[in-house]
Amino acid sequence: MAAAAGRSLLLLLSSRGGGGGGAGGCGALTAGCFPGLGVSRHRQQQHHRTVHQRIASWQNLGAVYCSTVVPSDDVTVVYQNGLPVISVRLPSRRERCQFTLKPISDSVGVFLRQLQEEDRGIDRVAIYSPDGVRVAASTGIDLLLLDDFKLVINDLTYHVRPPKRDLLSHENAATLNDVKTLVQQLYTTLCIEQHQLNKERELIERLEDLKEQLAPLEKVRIEISRKAEKRTTLVLWGGLAYMATQFGILARLTWWEYSWDIMEPVTYFITYGSAMAMYAYFVMTRQEYVYPEARDRQYLLFFHKGAKKSRFDLEKYNQLKDAIAQAEMDLKRLRDPLQVHLPLRQIGEKD
């Protein structure tokens, strides 16, 4: 009977519940009649609501980036006395520092080096264009300040907006170029003397260093040259002695031993043999048999033989001599008044 009563009660509940309201009423009655069943359904609904809330909260989260975007007020650009002054808040001490740059001569690399020298805590610094392209270190400051850019220091990104400046007209640009040329000439005229002195001092120091390296080699060369000169002189005197001996023998045979009729063919063959020897010298040396050149050749043969025997570094000696000659030539050109760009009147007075 209990089972039949339970089935009739369930049929009654199902007949009363229709749609959303019926479901709510059924739940209430079920909870009232069966407390355990109502608690379990209530916990299940609460769990589903919690899951949907967590998913919605995760979907509403934004993307997280590694770098921090800092307002542009931390980096400002102003012009003072015609020069751009960039104020940057340094990351280590969190204080502002001004950098005065020269728009013509300075570049992006100079500005970045100044930042790293001023704050040793900067590990990475770079400049990017608004679309994310890195600006080269060789780019001039005047070109950088024509448009907005991004300054990245470590993990901070600064959006910099330089003040817009009016571009010069063609006439003003030409006048500015003339002024730059005049200033450069004036600077050269005023500083040329100091530049000349510094360059002259540098060349003199180089000459002294080269001569100091050449001194020990020069002593060895002088000794080898002295021996080669001595041997060459002996060869020359030996040739003269040979010719004198030959003359004496021919004279003895011509006037004392035999007659001229017999010695004439002998002297002819001796003369012809001497001509053949000179021609053989030309074939071997590709030089004409002239006494000064023959003497110099013999001297060089003795010199190189002595240098090889003494292990003299002839190549290094020649390089040092060439370097000294070049330095002396540069020093002479440096002291030439025409190279100093002096006015014509002063050059005329010196001449």
From Swiss-Prot:
Effect listed in the UniProt record for changing D261 to A/Q: Abolished interaction with MICU1
Recorded consequence of changing G248W: Abolished calcium uptake
GO-annotated biological processes: calcium import into the mitochondrion; calcium-mediated signaling; cellular response to calcium ion starvation; glucose homeostasis; mitochondrial calcium ion homeostasis; mitochondrial calcium ion transmembrane transport; positive regulation of insulin secretion; positive regulation of mitochondrial calcium ion concentration
Reported effect, E257A: According to a report, inhibits calcium uptake. According to a subsequent report, does not affect greatly calcium uptake
Positions where N6-acetyllysine occurs in the chain: K332
Effect of C191A: Does not affect glutathionylation in response to reactive oxygen species
Region (N-terminal MCU domain): 75-165
Keywords: Acetylation, Calcium, Calcium channel, Calcium transport, Coiled coil, Glutathionylation, Ion channel, Ion transport, Membrane, Mitochondrion, Mitochondrion inner membrane, Phosphoprotein, Transit peptide, Transmembrane, Transmembrane helix, Transport
Catalytic reaction equation(s): Ca(2+)(in) = Ca(2+)(out)
Modification sites for S-glutathionyl cysteine: C97
Span(s) of short sequence motif Selectivity filter: 260-268
Domain of life per record: Eukaryota
Effect noted on mutating K180A: No effect on calcium uptake, oligomerization and interaction with MICU1 and MICU2
Mutation effect (Y291 to F/A/T/K): Does not affect gating by EMRE/SMDT1
Pfam families, A to Z: MCU (PF04678)
Residues with PTM Phosphoserine: S57, S92
Mitochondrial intermembrane side: 256-262
Coiled-coil segments: 192-223, 311-339
GO molecular function: calcium channel activity; identical protein binding; uniporter activity
Places the protein is found: Mitochondrion inner membrane
Effect of Y289F: Mitochondrial calcium uptake in the absence of EMRE/SMDT1
Residue numbers binding Ca(2+): E264
Subunit structure: Homotetramer. Component of the uniplex complex, composed of MCU, EMRE/SMDT1, MICU1 and MICU2 (or MICU3) in a 4:4:1:1 stoichiometry. Interacts with CCDC109B/MCUB; this inhibits channel activity. Interacts with MCUR1. Interactions with MICU1 and MCUR1 are mutually exclusive. Interacts with SLC25A23.
Protein name as it appears in the record: Calcium uniporter protein, mitochondrial
Organism whose genome encodes this protein: Homo sapiens
Gene from which the chain derives: MCU
